[in-house]
């Protein structure tokens, strides 16, 4: 019986030692890092026409618009050197109210960079009087 009490006492002391009191806690929650979002906006623009695309900015930062390509709608893949209007604004019914704009020809750099606060915005591509026929376009939008 003494041996059983000794084994029980040893087990109790060992478990008490393992419970050494640490008051610190370690969080295992993952941290969330929000990086830039890239969206491709593709469509067509008729002479004297426009197209727009709405998007949500999650945090204050730059919104970059790049008119990546413009091509003939009658001969897809044929690059057009025409200059179009490129703008950023806020959606308004079936259009986009322009806040900032720039003329742009297709290229691989941002033609319009605007610092924006969180909210709903839109990119608008439009004819500035140069189009003789409908064109296809692609705009890359990078934002936070």
Task: Annotate the PLM regions.
Residues 103-116:
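Beta-sandwich interaction modules
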Residues 1-8:
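Bacterial N-terminal signal peptides that target proteins for export
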Residues 38-78, 85, 111:
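Non-catalytic, beta-strand-enriched accessory regions in extracellular/secretory proteins
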Residues 20-36:
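Short, low-complexity, disordered segments immediately C-terminal to signal peptides
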Residues 61-63, 113-132:
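Noncatalytic modules at the cell exterior or secretory-pathway interfaces
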Residues 15-18:
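C-terminal motif of bacterial Sec signal peptides marking the signal peptidase cleavage site
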């Amino acid at each position: 019986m003494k041996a059983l009490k000794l084994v029980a006492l040893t087990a109790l002391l060992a478990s008490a030692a393992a419970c050494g009191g640490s008051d610190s806690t370690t969080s295992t929650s993952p941290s969330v890092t929000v990086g830039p979002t890239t969206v491709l906006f593709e469509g067509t623009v008729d002479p004297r026409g426009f197209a727009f695309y709405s998007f949500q900015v999650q945090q204050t930062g730059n919104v970059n618009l790049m008119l990546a390509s413009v091509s003939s709608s009658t001969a897809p893949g044929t690059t057009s050197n025409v200059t179009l209007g490129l703008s950023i604004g806020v959606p308004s019914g079936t259009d986009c109210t322009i806040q900032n704009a720039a003329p742009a020809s297709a290229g691989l750099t941002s033609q319009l960079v605007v610092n924006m606060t969180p909210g709903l915005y839109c990119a608008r591509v439009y004819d500035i009087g140069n189009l003789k026929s409908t064109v296809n376009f692609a705009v890359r939008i990078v934002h936070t």
